[in-house]
Amino acid sequence: MILSGKEILKHIGEDIIIEPFSEERINPNSYNLTLFNELLVYKNDTLDMKIPNETEKLIIPEEGLLLEPGKLYLGRTNEFTQTNKYVPMLEGRSSTGRLGLFIHVTAGFGDIGFAGYWTLEIFCVQPIRIYPNTEICQIYYHNIDGEYDLYNSGKYQNNNGIQPSLMYKDFEK
């Protein structure tokens, strides 16, 4: 079952952490998260799962940054989130989707216990100008049934910035 906006609000600061938090961004069953002012792009057209792929940092100026179709941009939320009780999920807002802007390719599912900034896998179907601090996506929370363990992977936990793929670490086991 998905938590209502009123339930999210009740649990802020205890079972749900969103920092910074603004009550105006609560929706009926989600909370709007905003876009940080930096992006990463991969330097090479061909990527390799078994190695760290080099990235380049782009700054999103106040006047906006034009994104190109067919290119993956990695961004992040301004907000740090954490919950040890609910399953966090991330989705694009319908307003961004109607502009042909995807904010995640496959990683919209979070784990109980994840603490950090959400890395956004941004992709557009046509050129689009984006702006920093835009309400770009929404987080919502599911209850979980049964016993569970908290997320304990060191790969992305407590990140401080945009996280490129760390899949190469899976091959080091």
Swiss-Prot record:
Chain residues that bind dCTP:
R93, S94, S95, T96, G97, R98, D111, T119, L120, E121, Q138, Y151
Q: What CDD domains does its record include?
A: trimeric_dUTPase
Site keyed Important for bifunctional activity: positions: G108, F109
The reply on keyword Nucleotide-binding is yes
Catalytic positions?
E121
Keyword ATP-binding included in the entry's annotation: no
Enzyme Commission identifier(s): 3.5.4.30
Please explain the role this protein plays, according to its UniProt record: Bifunctional enzyme that catalyzes both the deamination of dCTP to dUTP and the hydrolysis of dUTP to dUMP without releasing the toxic dUTP intermediate.
| Subunit record text | Homotrimer.
Q: Which family does it belong to?
A: Belongs to the dCTP deaminase family.
Q: What is this protein called?
A: dCTP deaminase, dUMP-forming
